[in-house]
Amino acid sequence: PHVRDFAYKEDYEGEHRQKQIDLAIQLFEAMGIKRDDKEKRMDWMLRGFRQFDAPVSLVLTYDKYLEPAGITHFGLGALAYGIILSAWERGVGCVINGQGIMQSHIVRKHANIPDDQSIMICIAMGYPDDNFAANDVRSVRADNDELLTYVGF
């Protein structure tokens, strides 16, 4: 079972589950992993727990005192976005990795994170391998019209 420091929806349903499945299909097709190849699928999952074998993993945390931490989560998202844009501008690839914190107690132990901090997310960082098929996969994004409502413009 997943053991995270914050409340998290474990099992997606409906359109959110379908998006998750569609991305997995894209990824496994790009990498030549067949649906029934449990060994290669497991290897991919374990790679996520290893931060995709990246040389650097940032672990973003916040002070537990701030819980419930809605605005803090927003702030950490903005921080992650800034770090990622800056890194990519310098040729360093990044992957936001929620899988890497599914066992927060293990991350806490190995990264020496104090108990008064909640682990929010990891960012795997390194120079991209242009020959690695997974690096070419891009998830399908909704159009702005599906996400935004303009009032007064």
Describe the role of every protein-language-model region.
Residues 1-153:
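Acidic, surface-exposed loops and disordered segments
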